[in-house]
Design a protein with these regions (language model features):
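Generic detector of short alpha-helix boundary/capping microenvironments
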Residues: 2, 20-21, 43-44, 86, ...
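C-terminal segment of classical bacterial N-terminal signal peptides
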Residues: 2-11
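Active-site-adjacent loops and short helices of periplasmic peptidoglycan-processing enzymes
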Residues: 11-169
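Domain-terminus/edge residues, biased toward the C-terminal soluble/receptor-binding domains
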Residues: 136, 147-152, 156-355
């Protein structure tokens, strides 16, 4: 059985999406994955040090922040650096700050070697994680992002990676840090939007001769978190600021379904009550523009049979827009319903008395 429960939303006036100087770019809502604007979003390109988003994630999943790591001579790579010295001992957490703030290639090599016993094995884990996240246009060949054959991604994949990474509390904390003291070093974050753009909470810069300037950032205002990615973009700072101004002006985060809110009644057979209230098992938010409508419909059995427990999933809410399904949310019993005691027939009562 399907019934319409409707949701119609109002939003800010329509805005025009900005143009950028990027070879490829995307602006995506982190919560729903909706692409708000973009160009060449699935074009495979070099991504430079934005690679280190994945490096940090794999390190967090395979190592412990308090691990003691000894720097080896072969960890001291070319390019951006946190200026490690062979024989130096740091914690994995300190290396992660060196990885994400000054974009240390030496930190990347050291982390990879420690967490997997070798860079090749670590890179294999990076690719396994990319596959698990649905990054179908991505291939990693090293943990730093230095130009290497077979090392590439696309704007869409990097946005998905960034959205996932920012849900990891330790990653988000480090990515949002402007400066950090690591021993005698004072590390500064290369992401200058942290200081200049309202609501910016991360993420990662990059540059190589082949990739050009690459930038992945995250910005949050009024509960809506957006991710911007630009690849090969000389004007990336200004372009990211313009993308966010567009995104927050043209879209509003609307709650289509509220967790715990009761949506409908369902008949119950064999229970102590004839019906039960059904509520949403979780909330669902979606960014919408002016004139866009979210439709919520319920799918549930014709009849439920007691006993039922509070929180038991018995149906689902379907959220759609313009005929496209966006999400399914469980409908759960808002209260328990016990089974009614079975009434004895006259024959059963007589049998009990004579038996």
């Amino acid at each position: 059985m399907v019934c319409s429960l409707l949701g119609c939303v109002d939003c800010a006036a329509a805005q025009s999406a900005p143009q950028t100087g990027a070879e490829a770019f995307i602006l995506m809502d982190a919560g729903s994955g909706r692409v708000l604007t973009g160009k060449n979003t699935e074009q495979e390109l070099a991504i430079a040090s934005t690679t280190k988003i994945m490096t940090a994630l794999v390190a967090l999943e395979t190592g412990n922040l308090s691990d003691k790591v000894t720097v080896k001579q072969n960890h001291l790579k070319e390019g951006s650096s946190m200026y490690l010295r062979a024989g130096e001992v740091l914690t994995l957490e300190e290396l992660l700050y060196g990885l994400l703030l000054p974009s240390g290639n030496d930190a990347a090599e050291c982390i990879a070697d420690h967490c997997s016993g070798g860079v090749e094995r670590f890179v294999a884990r990076m690719n396994e994680k990319a596959a698990a996240l649905g990054m179908t246009h991505t291939s990693f060949a090293n943990p730093s992002g230095l130009d290497t054959q077979g090392h590439y991604s696309c704007a869409l994949d990097m946005a998905r990676l960034a959205a996932y990474a920012m849900r990891e509390p330790t990653f988000a904390r480090i990515a949002a840090t402007r400066t950090a003291a690591v021993g005698e070093r004072m590390l500064g974050n290369h992401n200058k939007l942290l200081a200049s753009l309202e609501g910016c909470t991360g993420l990662k810069t990059g540059y190589t001769d082949n990739a050009g300037r690459t930038l992945v950032t995250c910005c949050e205002r009024d509960g809506m978190r957006l991710i911007a990615v630009t690849l090969n973009d000389r004007s990336d700072w200004a372009d990211h600021a313009a993308l966010y101004e567009y995104g927050f002006a043209a879209f509003a985060r609307k709650r289509a379904v509220a967790r715990g809110e009761e949506y409908t009644l369902a008949p119950v057979r064999g229970g102590t009550q004839a019906s039960v209230s059904l509520a949403a098992g979780e909330s669902f938010f979606y960014p919408v523009t002016a004139g866009e409508e979210l439709l919520v419909s319920a799918r549930l059995p014709e009849e439920l049979t007691a006993p039922l427990t509070a929180g038991q999933a018995v149906g689902e809410l379907i959220v759609s827009m313009d005929g496209e399904e966006l999400a399914r949310v469980s409908l759960v019993c808002a209260e328990p319903v016990a089974a009614a005691e079975k009434k004895q027939s006259l024959f059963e009562r007589l049998f009990d008395r004579t038996g």
